[in-house]
């Protein structure tokens, strides 16, 4: 309870309400109860944003019918960004791993056998992989499955090892809808973008807000996806359609239960 009170007082400090007691029956208690189920960083960030707005427009406080509902507009904006970035990361990782599997198989596998990952060049990475995942052998595994077991850090190492094979993918002249895509002409240039994405990915997957500017992050992911021959617009459209379908089925199911 002490922690809830501490956070609640911090939220009130950021909001800097002229008359907090006026919201006693207008969302203030609901706000306090929500602390135990909402994301701390996003809740604090939302309260800071609302506090700044109320300082800029003091009369706005009198127009708030429910403090909790009003604050949730700012909170939900942050969680929606988190979910959107999570989806971008999923698209990027999936496309990158699959494209790498195809290129490495074409360039370095034996004829009719997908065995590029058995190269001595990758022995350290493979032995570490087997140890982490408790694998005695890689019999029955193909390149797609192997790359799905590797971390993004190991993918970075593999791309560096085989940069001559991957450079055309990221550096060659390429257009999309008659627009020339920016190129990542050197390993260092690619690494800068990749490291940016990797850092944000780790933050998001550990349920933390990314400190990297969203516009910069999305821009780099979108460019890389298009260079990987992945159309993010189609993917987002299809995903949203699926979400709507799932939501509709859930509503129907709930209706049957009542």
Where are these regions (language model features)?
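Inter-helical turn/loop segments and adjacent helix faces that build the functional surface
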Residues: 207-213
């Amino acid at each position: 309870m002490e922690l809830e009170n501490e956070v609640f007082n911090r939220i009130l400090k950021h909001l800097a309400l002229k008359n907090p007691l006026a919201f006693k029956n207008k969302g203030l208690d609901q706000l306090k109860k929500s602390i135990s189920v909402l994301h701390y960083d996003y809740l604090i960030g939302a309260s800071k944003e609302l506090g700044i707005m109320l300082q800029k427009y003091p009369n706005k406080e009198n127009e708030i019918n429910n403090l909790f509902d009003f604050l949730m507009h700012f909170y939900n904006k942050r969680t929606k960004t988190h979910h959107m970035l999570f989806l971008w990361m999923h698209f990027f990782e999936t496309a990158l791993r699959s494209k790498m599997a195809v290129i490495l198989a074409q360039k370095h596998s034996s004829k009719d056998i997908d065995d590029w990952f058995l190269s001595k060049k990758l022995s350290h990475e493979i032995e570490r992989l087997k140890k982490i995942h408790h694998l005695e052998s890689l019999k029955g595994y193909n390149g797609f499955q192997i790359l799905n077991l590797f971390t993004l850090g190991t993918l970075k190492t593999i791309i560096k090892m085989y940069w001559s094979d991957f450079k055309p993918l990221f550096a060659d002249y390429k257009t999309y809808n008659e627009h020339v895509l920016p190129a990542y002409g050197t390993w260092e240039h690619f690494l800068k973008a990749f490291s940016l994405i990797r850092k944000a990915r780790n933050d998001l997957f550990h349920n933390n807000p990314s400190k990297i500017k969203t516009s910069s992050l999305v821009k780099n992911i979108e460019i890389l996806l298009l260079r990987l021959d992945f159309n993010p617009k189609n993917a987002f459209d299809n995903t949203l359609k699926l979400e709507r379908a799932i939501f509709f089925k859930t509503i129907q199911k709930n209706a049957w239960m009542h």
